[in-house]
């Protein structure tokens, strides 16, 4: 499956530069708003990753737009083409519900998957590049890092690509998650994690088991792309993100123990923040411009106290911005969409395609096409989408169409909605469901409704009327007109259209 081989972020950047996918910017650029403007224009033009080598006021380079095209997301997952991400999804579907070989031929077919599994265990190092430089105690100062302030009304600089490492009590497996972190001071950050996310759940369990005791946390900045992408991919609960990153990368993930706790962080990370969360210590977070295109509400989240900063020599700070799509999370969503399809098809073989339009904030609206087999089938599928993967917990709208509709063509989808739906019969409303905290349209923070649209052809039992059948052209006539089309010269002054 692998074709893009790299060991760490720096090696990945070198490979991108060889392909013309990385631009070094030597002019002084301000992390306050200017980097966002340049990155936004570059992303909208499907441009390269950006390495700002001279941030104003800092001596640490800033990397932006790393995942600014689906192609670079695929490369980060070890694939040359976006279409190959379906293979990543098939591998995840296999790992989620592995099946023993049915015979010798099946064993041969599955050997590549079994071979990849050999890269799953992590490799623990006693020393690592991420600990080449160490600051602790009073020497800790987050202001050395060129953290971007992305939008004019943002409350403060914001760490965006921090890979947060936690472990709940009595758990061997660590959790990796991407949570934004507002800079409060030289050694304080706000950890914005939602209550159902892995890090927040680990913290809740810790507080129950160890009341009043500090909760160890580590944040890796500038981890290798496979590890970052592993943290945002629907990895089975029995598989660690480090193990999955090893599968993507083609060799084992190397980790090292933190200086202040037993947590293990990526050995090649550019920067690592170590510290703790004091139970009960909270702070007001925000407002920040986010992926919806709006500034979000202010809310309270735990404070992360940093006791150690370790980093590589000549460290690179990896950052991004979030705003109205397209932004980097939206591009990431387009690429990960290809990973989701085989996972859903494993559970629901009737699904033909699944699409999360980026303009729907990457996850708030889904279009599903399916081979309908019985009355009520579309409603079963929409309920399945909402419940199967936690990534779709916040999907507000699910549109289900037949397999003659192209899920990725709005003209097709709108035609199906307007010709195959009766609003009262074919609309499903579900109230009091989990909703993204950033969704200010919901009546209560974190709780709102969902809508399912059954835009499939209706079967007996779903309608009492004779159902229409689509107009189709006569293929023989089409072939005849194809033969004489150029002679007709109808569009002689411009490109012919058929």
UniProtKB/Swiss-Prot annotation:
Record EC number: 4.1.1.98
* Uppermost EC category: lyase
Annotated compartments: Cell membrane
Pathway(s) it belongs to: Cofactor biosynthesis; ubiquinone biosynthesis
Instruction: Classify the protein's membrane topology as the record does.
Output: Peripheral membrane protein
* Protein name, per record: 3-octaprenyl-4-hydroxybenzoate carboxy-lyase
Q: Which cofactor does it need?
A: prenylated FMN; Mn(2+)
Q: Which SUPFAM superfamilies match?
A: FMN-binding split barrel, UbiD C-terminal domain-like
